[in-house]
Amino acid sequence: MKVLSSLASAKTRYPDCQVVRRRGRVYVICKSNPRFKAVQGRKKRR
């Protein structure tokens, strides 16, 4: 899964990709081609 600062290009990479919001983060998931998975933002430090 790629960590990107912006998902603008990741949304249109593949026709089956969909944008999902989970736990305050934005994910791009693609069940037919999982290599296009991406998440926006980075891990928070404690």
UniProtKB/Swiss-Prot annotation:
Pfam families: Ribosomal_L36
Signal peptide (residue range): none
GO cellular component, one term: ribonucleoprotein complex
GO biological process: translation
GO molecular function annotation: structural constituent of ribosome
Keywords: Ribonucleoprotein, Ribosomal protein
UniProt keyword Lipid biosynthesis, yes or no: no
InterPro entries in alphabetical order: Ribosomal_bL36 (IPR000473), Ribosomal_bL36_sp (IPR035977), Ribosomal_L36_bact (IPR047621)
Family: Belongs to the bacterial ribosomal protein bL36 family.
Stated name of the protein: Large ribosomal subunit protein bL36A
Species of the source: Sodalis glossinidius (strain morsitans)
